[in-house]
Amino acid sequence: MGDKDDVRIGVFVCHCGVNIKASVDVEEVVEYAKKLPGVVYATDYPFFCADPGQEIIQEAIKEHDLDRVVVAACTPKIHENTFRNCVKEAGLSPYYMEMVNIREHCSFVHMQEPEKATEKAKDLIRAAVERAKRLEDVPTKEVEVENSVLIIGGGIAGIQAALDLADQGFKVYLVEKEPTIGGNMARLAKTFPTDDCAMUILAPKMVQVGNHPNIEMITYAEVKDVDGYIGNFEVTIEKKPRYVDEDACTGCGVCAEVCPIEVPNEFDLGIGTRKAIYVPFPQAMPLVYTIDMEHCIQCGLCEEACPQDPPAIDFDQEPEEIRLKVGTIIVATGYEEFDASKLEEYGYGKYDNVITTLELERMINPAGPTEGHVIRPSDGKEPHRIVFIHCVGSRCPGKEEKGEAYCSRICCMFILKNAQLIKQHEPDAEVYCCYMDVRAFGKGYEEYYERAQKQFGVRFIRGRPAEIVEDPETKNLIVRVEDTLTGEPMEIEADLVVLGCGLVAPEETYSKLADILGIDRSPDGFFKELHPKLEPVSTKVRGVQIAGVAQGPKDIPDTVAQAKGAASEASIPMSQGKVEIELITATVDEDVCGGCGACAQVCPFDAIEMVEKDGKRVAEVQDVACQGCGQCAAACPSGAMQLRYYRDEQLMPQIEALLAEALEEEEEE
């Protein structure tokens, strides 16, 4: 760090068009900045992020011999790298630039209070100047990148990302917790708005994955631990025992034919049954049987029937631990339906003939448990009058007990597709859709919505049903709803009610992976992107990308597009072969360190080790593993642990300057 009394600071206040200037008096702020100790130059400009604005900064650095720069503009998330590169081109260290967010923190939050916005901008700039005086250069380190990638999740997002990366020559490890890849898309009959057969477009990609020389599928497995950093992630995977030799099994199915045990089929959401030895669906990849040991009675019939010599059945299989080293990671985990039983007024789980859209999907699917026939679970008869209810568990802000606040994006179209498929199968059926709003946002979606109304005669009622009551004799369902367009209360007697359930993040899976990978989750439970517009597939952990529903609910086209984006992002460091890591990391004053180990205990990245040096136990930081979170510095009782670029001697003067006027007023009182 330079001598804080000798630095020459330039302050540059951006208008951001009118975003800042409309609320902040930028000219007044500039005049204020000129009087701050250490500031030798200050000016404003409409767009400092544009080329002319950056030229102004670079010329000022040279003309006024500036060695520190403060840019008061918008969020650093968008333009910090822009201004770092700008000052670097002018000959300064990029770390000698301090950025102040006076758009989100001043202008936007005080849009109707220009005086407050202006005074707050002054306070923030005053504090930034004090920090700028003490900024230090940050060393960097170049590390080799492993030429392989881990993809977590074998749905359509994981499949597409795997194929894109494998085709570029990278080694891909595709980990899926189920016995087969395919995800929820494999459950679907058709896809909207083109009504393509879902398996017809998914299965070829599954086969490509299975046959690709650069892809290693690790199914029936879960990621248990991840250590390391971009370019060098060390991954531990636990592969569950199938009790069937994957190399020996040919998928002939003779074992399932002789198995005497039948249990509800989770792939069919409990509608159909499967044997204790099974494949989830005929097109499974890999086509290898799995023994459900929870229900298996170990009668040995499957082993006797197996035509392989020796039999592929292996009751002695144990969990296998697999260790990998990869350069990048893509998280492509999926979703589960909202638990509709939480809404007692709809009777899901209580009334036999109330089902969800995904359960209906398995009925409509010709390869499903009912071979494409929609039936009432109560009596097996085909329903004549069906009521769909939109937004079950979605769009419930402030009513957490009723569901999630967000829109799940696909539910409306999911219902429209199934409503049309029912009408195609049974033209005389009466189909009602109770909706709040129909959100047909994608390409061809509005036309698909119109087709449901005009061509198929699906009836739409604008209103969320208040309750569903079952007739105990007929098992029919009375749906009570008010049409908010006409104000008319209605009672519809339905043979079958289908709940359009929202998409939610499986809590156990997402919470575990967030902890293992060190990535954040959004308030909706899905994984949080680095920036919703500019970095939609990146996370706060460099080298870890997200794709598909892992980032939030979306349809298949958006999922595939995002998977391709994540694959592209993951390929960059692997193509380059090396990455430069800025070492904004923890540092240890070994003379002060007492060797207590508190820092190592709180480090979420296992970047700190306790070692012996000169007969003394001290902390040692692995720079490339440290993510600069600062938890160790906060936990250190002696002050020996500091975070480079965010040291106490840099932050405390900034805080004192920020509070200076408030403290002066307090003293006067």
UniProtKB/Swiss-Prot annotation:
GO molecular function annotations of the record: 4 iron, 4 sulfur cluster binding; metal ion binding; oxidoreductase activity
Binding annotation for FAD:
153-176
- Chain residues that bind [4Fe-4S] cluster 3: C593, C596, C599, C636
Q: Assembly and interactions?
A: The ferredoxin:CoB-CoM heterodisulfide reductase is composed of three subunits; HdrA, HdrB and HdrC.
Family matches, as Pfam families? FAD_oxidored (PF12831), Fer4_7 (PF12838), Fer4_9 (PF13187)
* Protein name according to UniProt: CoB--CoM heterodisulfide reductase iron-sulfur subunit A 1
Q: Name the PROSITE patterns for this protein.
A: 4FE4S_FER_1 (PS00198), 4FE4S_FER_2 (PS51379)
The biological pathway it contributes to is: Cofactor metabolism; coenzyme M-coenzyme B heterodisulfide reduction; coenzyme B and coenzyme M from coenzyme M-coenzyme B heterodisulfide: step 1/1
Checking SUPFAM superfamilies in the record gives: 4Fe-4S ferredoxins, FAD/NAD(P)-binding domain
The record's similarity note reads:
Belongs to the HdrA family.
Entry binding sites for [4Fe-4S] cluster 2: C259, C296, C299, C302
Per its UniProt entry, which superkingdom is the organism in?
Answer: Archaea
